[in-house]
From Swiss-Prot:
Lineage of the species this protein comes from: Eukaryota, Metazoa, Chordata, Craniata, Vertebrata
Record's keyword annotation contains Membrane: yes
Protein name (record): Transmembrane protein 214-B
InterPro entries named in the record: TMEM214 (IPR019308)
A Pfam family annotated for this UniProt entry: TMEM214
Transmembrane segments: 468-488, 606-626
Domain of life: Eukaryota
Described purpose of this protein according to its UniProt entry: Critical mediator, in cooperation with CASP4, of endoplasmic reticulum-stress induced apoptosis. Required or the activation of CASP4 following endoplasmic reticulum stress.
GO annotation (BP), single: apoptotic process
Originating species: Xenopus laevis (African clawed frog)
Chain intervals for the UniProt region annotation (Disordered): 1-94
Family matches, as PANTHER family: TRANSMEMBRANE PROTEIN 214 (PTHR13448:SF0)
Biased composition (Basic and acidic residues): 18-30
Family: Belongs to the TMEM214 family.
Length: 679
């Protein structure tokens, strides 16, 4: 504002207070804004450099003069003549801009160089207050990225809108966040509460800039929000009557889970699972869990995050009817239940399943839904099959859960043949214990239908144990042992194999003569091959040395020269790489997409898994097999490996192979002749 001086002279009047007073007020406001609020009180927002329009303020200072008296008297007349035109307020230093149709158009129109200049000004003016830098970044991006319609986040990918920005803008954002690592939580809170304030307005602005800043922080530092989840849960509960605000908080905090599976499970269990069942929030809570499990196919990183206290409420939500979930939501949660069960049981289910057995057993009542009863019985069977301690837990709970135990016993009767041998042994001991308990109850006269059902199931199990299938394998083993023992006794009785009855049978059948003929042929061929090698190998070796010796010497000399040259060049390259490798790494981090790093991480985990699971056991087994074979070979040669021993071993192997081949051929020939004779 301006007015004429009493003496009729022009007088320069500046807007507001003095610059020193204004800056002092700004620093005071900024200091107040940096204080982290306790509880759920909203963060007091300070004016950022961009919002104050410091650049325009400095340009306008010293240029405003007091107009003449007649000019000041004409202003009300002009305002009356043009009532539609409003006088711009002195505090509005930022001009309104037109909105873009899509976020892609807004990002293309964004002037990255201007953003860089504004951020540099902010850092120069407030070098010791990085919270102003990050707030300026959020305010600038949100002001510039205005669209006609706000996209529905539930219909977009989990990394939207951060996935749309280019590498240059990502580099600027990341470099600024790297300079302010201690105020990242302040930035996230600033963006969240700014979005909540915009939602209070009838025609609020788009929130793309705030969302991009939240994603940029939590993609690298997910623990920024997971370290204080109770605060966000209280904030969520305070806005339950405003679904859009709740979804905004859930979306913002949920961004921490897409780079770290453990932090994502913390977010879902600590923020979204408590509101599961709230009508307007349940769809996003289930969708977030689906996207989280889809983004992290390797569930091993989440082992230990879900315990019995969290798992069984999830089980009830997934299978119990008439709860606060709709049938479609319950079906979606039921599809995710198997992965949640794997996470709950952990890497060693054989040592943790007995802790889940009591809760499984108490829920497996005859009146529970069929699908839930099927899942509970299957889980109880897994507990008994994998964790032997579950049997002792079952024996302790038997008298308190007779109806549930009868269902489990009947299931064991139906699936008895498919149970493992170790489980059958434990079931036998448990059933005998149950029989004793049933007898005690019957003696006291406290019989019931559930007790009778349990007793009948125990009787059926005992009957199953006694009436097993025909032991074919035992019969085959016994027959083989009997045949081998008979031959051995026959040879021992007649003092030699040639005089034994077994040899006579083989002689009459023609097998003995055939095997002798085969052995003679193999021995003859082996002797011929040995004599050929003894005659020709020295001659061929001398010729090879005469022809290839000079060539091999030249190759060896060239190899030495090439090795020396490679070492010389390699040292130069190593020194060059040592000097330039940090720059290359920094350039790669700013240029390569994040998906490439994720793919490399997945590939590394796959190779590590293959190395530990398959390669190392295979190498160990191969080493043991080779060592065992060599020991057996040395033992067969009486501890000394000679050429005669090698020749004998080769002869034995050849004889055995030829005998087996001839026997197989004769068997096949006889079978073919039999088939032909039938026709």
């Amino acid at each position: 504002m301006a007015s004429g001086a009493p003496d009729g002279k022009w007088k320069v009047v500046k807007k507001g207070k003095k610059s020193g007073e204004r800056r002092e007020g700004e620093r005071k406001a900024l200091t107040e804004s940096n204080v982290t609020p306790g509880g759920t009180a909203p963060i007091k927002m300070a004016n950022t450099v961009y919002e104050m329009g410091f650049d325009r303020i400095h340009k306008k200072q010293n240029k405003e003069q007091v107009p003449p008296n007649n000019m000041s008297s004409e202003q009300p007349q002009k305002q009356q003549q043009n009532p539609g035109k409003k006088k711009p307020q002195s505090g509005d230093s930022v001009c309104k801009q037109s909105k873009f149709h899509t976020l892609e158009c807004a990002l293309k129109a964004l002037d990255v160089a201007e953003l860089q200049r504004d951020l540099e000004k902010s850092q120069n003016m407030f070098p010791e207050n990085p919270s102003i830098w990050v707030k300026d970044l959020a305010g600038y991006l949100n002001y510039k990225l205005q669209t006609v319609k706000n996209d529905v986040l539930i219909q977009q990918s989990h990394d939207y809108p951060y996935c749309l920005i280019n590498k240059e803008l990502k580099g600027i954002v990341r470099s600024l966040l790297a300079k302010a690592p201690h105020v990242l939580d302040v930035m996230v809170d600033h963006c969240i509460f700014s979005m909540l304030q915009e939602l209070d307005k009838p025609t609020g602005e788009s929130l793309h800039g705030y969302r991009i800043c939240i994603q940029a922080v939590l993609l690298d530092k997910p623990k920024t929000v997971t370290s204080n989840l109770p605060k966000y849960l209280e904030l969520l509960r305070s806005h339950l009557n405003r679904p859009m605000k709740c979804l905004t908080v859930m979306w913002a905090v949920g961004q921490a889970g897409f780079t770290d599976f453990t932090e994502g499970l913390k977010v879902w269990l600590g923020l979204m699972f408590p509101v599961l069942g709230v009508k307007n929030l349940t769809p996003y809570a289930i969708l977030y869990l689906d996207r989280l499990l889809l983004a992290h196919s390797n569930l091993t990183k989440g082992f230990g995050m879900i315990g019995p206290k969290d798992f069984f409420p999830i089980l009830d939500f997934a299978f119990m009817p008439n709860n606060s979930l709709t049938p479609s939501q319950q079906e979606n949660l039921r599809n995710l239940y198997p992965k949640l069960k794997v996470l709950a049981l952990g890497a060693t289910p054989e040592s943790t399943l007995h802790t889940y057995f009591p809760s499984f057993l108490s829920r497996a009542t005859p009146s529970c839904p069929a699908e839930m009863r099927k899942e509970l019985i299957h889980s109880l069977t897994d507990c008994l099959n994998k964790d032997s301690l579950s049997f002792s837990v079952w024996r302790q709970l038997y008298t308190k859960h007779l109806s549930q135990s009868s269902l489990l016993l009947q299931h064991l009767v139906e699936t008895w043949d498919s149970n493992s041998r170790a489980m059958r042994k434990s079931v036998r001991e448990t059933v005998h214990s149950f029989k004793v308990t049933n007898g005690e109850f019957s003696g006291k006269g406290s019989s019931s239908k559930d007790l009778e059902a349990c007793d009948a199931a125990c009787q059926a199990l005992l009957h199953k144990m006694k009436s097993g299938g025909f032991p074919w394998w035992r019969l085959i083993v016994i027959a083989f042992v009997f045949l081998f023992g008979s031959v051995l006794y026959d040879v021992r009785t007649h003092n030699s194999f040639q005089e034994s009855t077994s040899a006579q049978i083989l002689q009459q059948s023609g097998l003995l003569s055939v095997s002798r003929e085969a052995w003679n042929k193999v021995s003859n061929y082996s002797l011929q091959g040995q004599s050929w090698l003894e005659r020709n190998v020295p001659q061929y070796y001398s010729q090879a040395v005469e022809v290839l010796g000079p060539v091999l010497e030249q190759v060896w000399a060239k190899t030495q020269e090439g090795g020396a040259y490679a070492c010389e060049k390699g040292s130069v390259l190593l020194s060059y790489a040592k000097d330039n490798l940090p720059r290359l790494i920094e350039w790669l981090h700013s240029s390569i997409p994040d998906s490439v790093f994720q793919f490399i991480e997945y590939l590394r985990e796959l190779l590590l898994h293959l190395h530990q699971t398959y390669l190392l056991p295979a190498v160990t087994y191969l080493e043991a097999a080779v060592q065992n074979s060599w020991q057996q070979y040395v033992k067969s040669c009486n501890g000394k490996v000679t050429w005669d021993c090698v020749r004998g071993q080769v002869g034995n192997i050849s004889h055995s192979s030829w005998t087996y081949l001839q026997n197989t051929t004769m068997t096949f020939t006889n079978w073919a002749l039999t088939i032909i004779s039938r026709h």
